[in-house]
């Protein structure tokens, strides 16, 4: 009987072991199935092949600060110069088709409306004003030469300039004293009241942008010896400015070649320290040259010109651009000549405009570079 119960006990223990083994196997199967479900499909394949199946866990960390961009202090200064401007009539006489008739009928913005978009985009626009602005009845001064001309208009004609983004004028020419001291003083007062900068034979215009200062020295240039006084003024201006421009008035009228004395004088002015030299007075274009690295423009021609019904119908705007790098340091200058018509009608309608015709435009550019004898 004892052996009987021992056999039964052994059998029960064996069954328990079998059950335990089965339970363990089932547990392992469940674990494996669970792992297989959550792991990537190629896990076991990679495991067999020996490929790594490690998962890289990204740990959040403080991002490295991006380096601050270097400050960019680059900029440019763009200036536009236009030539002989007479917004008036001979002795202030109004006749059919005259400038005065147009000025009485048209809004001031009419005269320069085709050029204004250029002036609006620059930093400073400067023209040569060749008439008296006064509402007084003044007597023309006597001249000891013939033919002589006197130009005067109502003071409100200054709005032709201010309405079209002109910022400064040279009142340094042979017409500033057409009506004596009274006419001169009235004109200066009108210019100042309009908020325009102005230069005279003794007063220099200064324009500043981002602490860079440009001087515009205006003067008559009727003989070579006048260059000495201009050079003196250039040197004085250089003590308080960074870039010196000379805008002179002189030479023989209605000829396309600059006088020999004017060429010699302009070159002396460059040797005396001027950074740019620009001329006016001939009422026609004269070419430019580069002398010792400095540009000389001998005549810009007319601009808005009320002095004649049929003046030569070519002129230029001269634009100069000074460039500054990221550190705000001056790096050099470049220029552009913009060929224009003095008027756009069959006769003078006192409304200059940019030349669009490519052949006519190129003719003017070739003339200014000395390649042809006439801009027409």
What are the roles of these predicted feature ranges?
Residues 1-11:
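N-terminal targeting leaders characterized by basic, low-complexity, disordered sequences
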Residues 2-3, 18-376:
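Acidic, metal/ion-coordinating pockets
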Residues 12-16:
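Membrane-interface segments at the starts/ends of alpha-helical transmembrane spans
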């Amino acid at each position: 009987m004892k052996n009987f119960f021992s056999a039964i006990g052994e059998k029960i223990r064996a069954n328990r072991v079998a059950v335990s083994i089965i339970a363990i196997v089932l547990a392992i199967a469940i674990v494996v199935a669970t792992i297989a479900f959550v792991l990537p499909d190629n896990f076991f394949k990679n495991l067999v092949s020996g490929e790594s199946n490690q998962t890289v866990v990204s740990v959040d960390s403080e991002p490295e600060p991006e380096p601050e961009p270097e400050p960019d202090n680059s900029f440019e200064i763009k200036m536009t110069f236009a030539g002989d401007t007479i917004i008036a009539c001979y002795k202030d006489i109004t006749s059919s088709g005259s400038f005065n008739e147009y000025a009485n009928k048209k809004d001031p913005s009419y005269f320069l409306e085709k050029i204004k978009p250029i002036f609006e985009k620059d930093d400073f626009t400067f023209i040569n004003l060749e008439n008296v602005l006064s509402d007084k009845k003044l007597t023309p001064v006597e001249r000891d030469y013939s033919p002589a001309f006197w130009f005067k208009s109502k003071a409100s004609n200054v709005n032709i300039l201010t309405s079209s983004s002109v910022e400064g004028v040279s009142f340094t020419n042979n017409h500033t004293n057409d009506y004596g001291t009274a006419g001169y003083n009235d004109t200066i007062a009108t210019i100042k009241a309009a908020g325009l900068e102005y230069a005279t034979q003794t007063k220099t215009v200064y324009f500043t942008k981002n602490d860079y200062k440009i001087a515009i020295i205006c003067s008559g240039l009727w003989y070579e010896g006048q260059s000495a006084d201009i050079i003196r003024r250039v040197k004085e201006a250089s003590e308080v400015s960074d870039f010196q421009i000379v805008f002179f008035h002189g030479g023989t009228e209605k000829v396309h070649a600059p006088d020999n004395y004017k060429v010699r004088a302009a070159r002396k002015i460059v040797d005396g320290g001027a950074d740019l030299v620009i001329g006016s007075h001939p009422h026609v274009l004269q070419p430019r040259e580069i002398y010792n690295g400095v540009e000389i423009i001998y005549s810009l021609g007319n601009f808005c010109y009320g002095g004649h019904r049929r003046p030569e119908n070519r002129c230029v705007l001269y634009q100069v651009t000074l460039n500054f790098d990221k550190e705000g340091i001056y790096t050099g200058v470049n220029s552009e000549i913009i060929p224009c018509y003095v008027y756009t009608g069959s006769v003078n309608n006192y409304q200059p405009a940019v030349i669009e015709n490519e052949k006519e435009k190129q003719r003017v550019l070739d003339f200014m570079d000395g390649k042809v004898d006439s801009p027409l």
